[in-house]
Amino acid sequence: MKNIGDSRVVESREVSGGMAIRRRREAPDGRRFTTYERIEKPNLAVIKRSGTRELFDRTKLSLAVSRSVGKFLKSDEEVEAIISAVEDALYALGDSEVSSRQIGEFVLDELAHRNEVAYVRFASVFQKFETLDDFVQILEKRKAIKEG
């Protein structure tokens, strides 16, 4: 495809909650392809537990969530939905910096209504569980929330 400008738009639709536009295009020779227009988000700094700062990395968060919850989520799409929801919540704060603790809390909020085992697994990594009592405490907390 030499020049995207020669193509015509066949279909347009909003995706990612209005944060992007997906366009189906057709080249003069009849070939079809898809383009995406995304809103560029401002840089977001993460303040780590050590006090150091680094840029928010969606891929890093996705890998951390996938690793910690194992196979307890139904699909990669479910992990992606969690990461998107967390990212949206972070940008909705309107701050240029966010703590790693806030990110972990947002992930726990998303996992809480998706999969209880994934929630406990992530909590054990995020909150650095060291004893069985740590597990018992989080399980009792989740049970009280579920019953109440």
Q: Where are the language model's segments positioned?
A:
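Short cysteine-rich clusters marking metal-coordination/redox-active sites
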Residues: M1-N3, E26-A27
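Conserved phosphate/pyrophosphate-binding and hydrolysis machinery centered on Walker-type P-loop NTPases
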Residues: E54-L55, D76-V79, L93-R101, V125-F129
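Short metal-binding segments enriched for Cys and/or His
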Residues: E26-L44
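Amphipathic alpha-helical segments that form the core helices of the histone-fold
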Residues: E80-G94, G104-E110
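Long C-terminal interaction/binding lobes of large macromolecular proteins
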Residues: Q102, L108-A112, A118, A123-G148
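Short linker/helix segments within small regulatory modules
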Residues: S12-R22
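Short Cys/His-rich "knuckle" micro-motifs
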Residues: G5-S12, Y36-I39
